[in-house]
Every structure is written in structure tokens, then in C-alpha cells.
Amino acid sequence: RRDWARFADLHPAFRMGDDREVGCYAATIDFVRGTLPAGGVQEVVNHWQALRDADDGCTYAASELFSARQLPALEVWRKARLSAEANRQRATRDAVAIAAPDVSNLVADLYANPAKFLGSRVAAPTRQRQELVVLALIRLAAKDPDNAAALLESKWGVQLSHEERHWTWGVIGKQAALRLSPSAMEHFDKVAKDSDLSDDLLGWKVRAALRAGDWKAVHR
């Protein structure tokens, strides 16, 4: 019900500090009151991106912070990417609806048939369209990483930002590594900046490097 006054009264007595959604509600109250501490926005990001399923608390907090220009669009899109990789369509749509509400209806299309979604488009001229392409490539990689890699290499890579391209190669590399494919490290080698990857993707890059005997990549 978002009864913030009642929540503020009860929250100090709440002992389960590991509830991410409650933490986001508390951050929302602090933000509304103007008492959100330094690092509060990052805490919301950490809670939100760690949740696999769609939620109200962190999604609402992220929406409020984004509307107030306190939350970078990149973090919202990264939440959408993480949700797409986890096959959580509602959570993906919720994130897209924050950053780009006018294209959130397209999430259903890229989930239903990512190859068709990518094949029906010639270009991605805007940030929103680029990110939808990234989401579609992530969904395609879950089913067919080789096809996703081919499309990224031949068509979409030049249209994406460096960060978008690196993240997508990381996801494709992870999916290849999950299948014990020898091509996994080839995909990860296309990531020129490791800081563009999530901790999870970095972990999979190390696993792929170990399997390939690429000790230089392991120590990087």
C-alpha cells in the first residue's frame, strides 16, 4: 500500500536485514525525506540487480531515483540485461519501462522469438533500440550462442556502444562456457574492457580461460 509513515514506524524493529525489497523501501523513504545517505543509490542498485524475480520495492525505488536523475540509465539497462539472462520477462519489462516506457511493449516480442526480432530490424539508431538489440541477443544466446555470436559479429556489433558490445560478448561467452564449447574464450577475447562486465560474467571468463589453459587471461 506504500503507507510510508507506517513503514517508517515499523522498519527500525525489523530484524531481517537481508531482505532486499525492505531495504529498497527504506531507501525510498530516505530519498523522499531527503535523508538518503551517501552510497544509498548504489545500495538500491545492488539490491535491485541481485533480485532475480520482479519485485515492487526495488523497482519502485529505482523508478523514483531514475525520475529524479539520481540513477544512471546504464544501471537500469543492466538490470534489464540481467533479468533477460535469467529469463525473467516481467522483471525485464519492468526495467525497460523505467528507462524507455515507449518501447517496453517490445520486450514480449524479443522474448517470443529473438531471432525474428533481430532479423526484422535493419538498424538500431537510438540508445533504446540498441539496448533492445542487446536484450534480444542475450535471449538468443541462451538458446543458440553460435547464432548470437554470428549476428553480433556480422550485423549488430558496429551499431552498439563499446560497453553494450562487451557485455553481449560476455553473455555469449558465458553461454558457450556452460556448454563446454571451445569457442567460449574466443568470445570473451572480444571483450576489450573487463570492467564492462558483471562480476558473474567475469567469473565465467576466468572459468573459460582455465578450461582453455589461457593462464595470461586468468591472471588478468
PLM-predicted stretches and their roles:
Residues 1-220:
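Alpha-helical solenoid repeat scaffolds
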